[in-house]
Design a protein with these regions (language model features):
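Acetyl-CoA-dependent GNAT
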Residues: 1-49, 53-54, 66-68, 72, ...
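A generic structural signal for beta-strand entry/edge sites
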Residues: 42-44, 80, 118, 210-212, ...
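Active-site acidic-Proline motif in GNAT/NAT acetyltransferases
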Residues: 53-55, 59, 87-88, 221-223, ...
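Loop/helix-junction capping segments adjacent to catalytic residues or to phosphate/diphosphate-binding pockets
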Residues: 59, 90, 137, 209, ...
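Conserved GNAT acetyl-CoA-binding A-motif
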Residues: 66, 72-85, 234, 241-254
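C-terminal "cap" of GNAT-fold acetyltransferases
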Residues: 82-99, 105-136, 150, 247-260, ...
Length: 295
């Protein structure tokens, strides 16, 4: 039992504050950890006060508290979950990134005694977002997990099985640089608050090719297929291409892996086929199909 007024009187004020906002406050054990959640405008919920006693770091309590607050927010109809974290707390950044949060929006200064500056992290419950360079960097580890899962399931996306974690992470770090340079538009898709899919729009920069763009690394985690993420990602990429003035889209895909049927259903047409284009983990050579779509 915890005597709030005697042992932690500040908790009563915190609990009253979040209740007044229509939210909730949870504590664990003898105040070994705590978390709060409160609604914002527009269907978003904010996760606040995520604290775990240092002696329990790595024990899983932080994950349990965060998931408890997220479940409550989703049960209340949240469409997005946001939080703020000190720019100096790299361990916290990785923790949130492992739970599919990405950097989103500008930083904020609190003008407090510690001169705190905070990053804003967010994730939609469902849907697709375009990631800027900061968002891409914060998503690298989760995107690496998605890439490895797709490669392990047989996807033909330039890598052989098994794909080492460090190679997958190195690939996405390179993509972050290209996003920052404006060469690539990167999109991520969430389902039930989990970052589970991605696609890239590669913008051709040659003077004679500025009307073209290429769809690349179209990936949906095997555990999340059949939920419409593929269509949502392509919708976002094609809309962005049109906004950028690109009228011709190109891609290549392995015939018979399912993605080619999705593209055909969406109005893509086959422009050519190259036999023996890839040699994969089983030692066999496979064809690739070049497809195009005019916007």
């Amino acid at each position: 039992m915890l005597d709030v007024d005697l042992e932690a009187p500040e908790l009563r004020a915190l609990a009253s504050y979040y209740r007044g906002r229509g939210g909730m406050l949870w504590v664990a054990g003898e105040v070994d950890g705590m978390v709060a959640a409160a609604p914002l405008d527009g269907g978003a919920w904010e996760i606040c006060r995520v604290y775990v006693h240092p002696r329990l770091h790595g024990a899983g309590l932080g994950r349990e508290l965060l998931e408890l607050a997220e479940r409550h927010a989703l049960a209340q109809g949240a469409t997005e979950v946001v939080l703020w974290t000190d720019t100096r707390f790299r361990r916290a950044h990785r923790f949130y990134e492992n739970h599919s949060y990405v950097r989103a929006g500008p930083i904020r200064a609190l003008h407090d005694i510690a001169n705190t500056v905070e990053y804003r992290y967010a994730k939609p419950v469902h849907g697709v977002r375009q990631l800027d360079a900061a968002g891409a960097q914060s998503a690298e580890r989760r995107l690496a997990d998605v890439l490895r899962a797709c490669v392990d399931s047989g996807a033909s996306v330039s890598f052989l099985r098994p794909l080492a974690p460090e190679r997958a992470l190195d690939f996405w770090q390179g993509i972050t640089r290209r996003v920052g340079q404006g060469e690539v538009l990167l999109f991520a898709a969430w389902s039930e608050g989990v970052l589970a899919g991605t696609v890239q729009l590669v913008l051709h920069t040659a003077e004679i090719g500025r009307h073209r763009a290429e769809i690349a690394k179209f990936l949906v985690h095997p555990a999340f297929r059949g939920r419409g993420l593929g269509d949502a990602l392509l919708d976002a990429a094609e809309a962005a291409a049109a906004t950028a003035g690109r009228t011709l889209l190109l891609l290549d895909t392995k015939p018979g892996d399912g993605a080619d049927r999705l593209y055909a259903r969406r109005g893509w047409t086959e422009a050519g086929r190259i036999e023996g284009y890839t040699r994969e983990s089983d030692g066999r050579e496979y064809a690739t199909v070049i497809m195009l779509k005019r916007l």
